[in-house]
UniProtKB/Swiss-Prot annotation:
Region feature Disordered, mapped onto this chain: 474-494
Entries under InterPro entries matching the protein: CBM_sf_5/12 (IPR036573), Cellulose/chitin-bd_N (IPR004302), GbpA_2 (IPR041029), GbpA_D3 (IPR054063), GlcNAc-bd_A (IPR020879), GlcNAc_Chitin_IntDeg (IPR051024), Ig_E-set (IPR014756)
Primary localization: secreted
GO terms assigned for molecular function: carbohydrate binding; chitin binding; hydrolase activity, hydrolyzing O-glycosyl compounds
Protein name (record): GlcNAc-binding protein A
Record-annotated Chitin-binding type-3 domain positions: 435-484
Keywords noted in UniProt: Chitin-binding, Secreted, Signal
Length: 494
C-alpha cells in the first residue's frame, strides 16, 4: 500500500509539472479562449485548440530572442493551435479596447509557480493581413508583472496600462513558468476607436444570430434562414438558397450567398460584417445578423437540409503562388492583378485582396488537385497605396496554409493620350454600328462585335457576363491589340 501511494504521488507530480501546467488569458478573452465553448465559440475553424485553449502557444521561453518562430507566434510548437496563425483583418473576433488601465485575468488548469508575465502590442502601422512576426510588434513590453508562487485559486489578475492605439491591434501576452523552460503565449485581438475619438452610430445595433459556415455543402442541399418574433416563426420572412454545384457549396460561398440574399430581400435585417462606418456588408465567411429599430425580429436560425453527400478526399496538400508584381498602375480606380497558383494534392483556395483600410477589394475561389492555374482578379473603386493579396488553402482534413503578398497600387500620374476618334472602316462603319448592343445576360466568343455607350468593341477571346466593354480593367484602348489580359478591344466610336 505504501509503495502504491509513493507511485501515485510521483504520477501527480509528473502531471502537475507538465500536462497540467497550462493556462490562458480569460479576460480580455484571448484568441484561443474565444474558440472554446466557454468563450462563446465566437472564433470558428480553430482546430483542436477549441477543446483545450490552455495548451495554446506552449513553447520555449526567452521571447523575443528565442521562443516561437515568426509566422507561428500564436501556436508556437504546439500543433493543437496551428490554425491560430492565420492572420487577416477579418479572420478573428475583436475585443473592444481603449488606452489606460486594463485588468488581465489568466486562468490556470493547475497551480504552477510564475516567473513573470509580459505583454507586447503590434505597432500602429502593422499589416494585419500578413502572418504575425517580430517585426509586427513593438518588442519592448508595455507591461511586465513579476512572478511569485503558484496560484491557489486557479487564476490570477493584474492591471497593466494599455498604450495609445487606433484600429485593429494584437496584444501578445506571455506567461513564463518558473520551474520549466516553457512559456505560454496568447494573443488578444483588440479593436481601438479611431484617431478622432468619434463613435459612429450604426442603425444596425442589435445582433440576433449568425450565419456560421462550418461545412461545405453538396449540389441539391438547401440552406434556410428562419426568423422568429414574439409570436413564433415568421414563415413569410424565410430566406432560402439551393446549392447548384460544388463551387456554390463551398462554405464561404454559400454563407456569402445567403447573407447577400437576405440583404437584398429585407430592409430591416442585415447580415455580414460591420465596418468602421456602421455599414453591414455580406462577407465570405461568418456573417453576423443585425436588425434596426424598425424590426421586431428576436432571433434568426440557419437550417440546412442535406442531399446525399459526395465523396471527401483525405489527402494532405499544399500550394504555392507566384507571378505577382510589386506595383500596379490603376486607371480610373480599376486594375486587374494576375498570378499563378499550383497545388500538390487537392486544395480549396480562397484569394482576397485587402486595401490599406482592410476593406476587401477583390475575391476569387477555386479548387485544384495536382494542378496549376492562372488567376485574374479585377478590382474597381481603388485608391493608391499598399494592398495585400491573401491566399488561404484548405485541404480535405481541414489543414490550412496561408500566403500573403504585399503590392502597391499607383495613382494615375500620366493622363492617357487622347486619340482622335476614327470610325472603323473594316466591314464598313455603318455595318459595324448595326452590331447588337452588349448584354450582361450573355457571354461572347472571340471576334464577337458589340456596341455599348456609343462605341464599338470586339472580344479578343471568350468574354463572360461580368466583363463590361469600356471598363478600364477589361478594355484594350491601345489601338493595336497589345493590351495584355484585356478581353475587349475598343474599335472606336459608332
Amino acid at each position: 500500500m505504501k509503495l502504491n501511494k509513493i507511485m501515485l504521488a510521483m504520477v501527480v507530480m509528473s502531471i502537475s509539472g507538465t500536462a497540467m501546467a497550462h493556462g490562458y488569458i480569460e479576460n480580455p478573452p484571448s484568441r484561443n479562449f474565444l474558440c472554446n465553448a466557454q468563450g462563446g465559440s465566437l472564433n470558428k475553424d480553430c482546430g483542436g485548440v477549441q477543446y483545450e485553449p490552455q495548451s495554446s502557444g506552449e513553447t520555449a521561453d526567452g521571447f523575443p530572442q528565442q521562443g516561437p518562430v515568426d509566422g507561428k507566434l500564436a501556436s508556437g510548437d504546439n500543433w493543437v493551435s496551428v490554425n491560430l496563425n492565420q492572420q487577416t483583418a477579418e479572420r478573428w473576433t475583436k475585443v473592444k479596447m481603449k488606452a489606460g488601465p486594463q485588468e488581465f485575468k489568466w486562468k490556470f488548469t493547475a497551480a504552477h509557480p510564475i516567473a513573470d508575465f509580459k505583454y507586447y502590442m503590434t505597432k500602429q502601422d502593422w499589416n494585419p493581413n500578413q502572418p504575425l512576426t517580430r517585426d509586427s510588434l513593438d518588442l519592448t513590453p508595455f507591461c511586465v508583472i513579476p512572478g511569485g508562487p503558484a496560484s491557489t485559486t486557479g487564476s490570477t489578475t493584474h492591471t497593466c496600462n494599455i498604450p495609445e492605439r487606433t484600429g485593429y491591434q494584437v496584444i501578445y501576452g506571455a506567461w513564463d513558468v518558473s520551474d520549466t523552460p516553457g512559456t505560454f503565449y496568447n494573443m488578444i485581438d483588440a479593436e481601438f476607436d479611431g484617431a478622432t475619438g468619434e463613435v459612429v452610430v450604426s442603425e444596425w445595433t442589435k445582433s440576433i444570430g449568425n450565419i456560421e459556415p462550418h461545412d461545405d455543402l453538396n449540389a441539391g442541399d438547401t440552406v434556410k434562414l428562419r426568423m422568429f418574433d414574439q409570436q413564433g416563426e415568421r414563415s413569410d420572412l424565410v430566406v432560402e438558397i439551393t446549392i447548384a454545384d460544388a463551387k456554390e457549396g463551398k462554405k464561404n460561398n454559400w454563407s456569402h450567398a445567403l447573407a447577400s440574399k437576405l440583404n437584398n430581400t429585407h430592409q430591416d435585417i442585415r447580415a455580414g460584417k460591420k465596418d468602421s462606418k456602421g455599414t453591414v456588408t455580406a462577407t465570405h465567411g461568418a456573417n453576423a445578423i443585425f436588425i434596426n429599430a424598425n424590426s421586431n425580429i428576436l432571433r434568426a436560425e440557419v437550417q440546412i437540409e442535406k442531399s446525399p453527400a459526395g465523396e471527401v478526399s483525405a489527402t494532405d496538400a499544399s500550394f504555392s503562388a507566384n507571378g505577382m508584381k510589386k506595383e500596379y498602375q490603376m486607371a480610373d480606380g480599376a486594375l486587374a492583378i494576375h498570378f499563378d497558383v499550383k497545388t500538390m494534392g487537392s486544395m480549396d483556395l480562397e484569394a482576397k485582396v485587402f486595401a490599406a483600410d482592410n476593406s476587401v477589394k477583390g475575391y476569387k475561389d477555386m479548387t485544384l488537385e495536382d494542378a496549376s492555374q492562372h488567376v485574374s482578379i479585377a478590382m474597381t473603386g481603388l485608391k493608391a497605396g499598399k494592398h495585400t493579396l491573401v491566399i488561404l488553402g484548405t485541404d480535405a482534413q481541414g489543414k490550412t496554409q496561408q500566403q500573403s503578398i504585399d503590392f502597391m497600387v499607383k495613382g494615375e500620374t500620366v493622363k492617357p493620350e487622347v486619340k482622335p476618334e476614327v470610325k472603323p472602316e473594316v466591314d464598313g462603319a455603318n455595318k459595324q454600328c448595326t452590331a447588337p448592343a452588349w448584354s450582361n445576360k450573355s457571354s461572347y466568343q472571340a471576334k464577337d462585335t458589340v456596341t455599348h455607350n456609343g462605341r464599338i468593341y470586339m472580344s479578343k477571346w471568350w468574354a463572360d457576363k461580368a466583363s463590361v466593354p469600356g471598363d478600364a480593367a477589361v478594355t484594350d484602348t491601345t489601338g493595336n491589340g497589345s493590351g495584355w489580359g484585356k478581353v475587349w478591344e475598343d474599335k472606336g466610336a459608332c
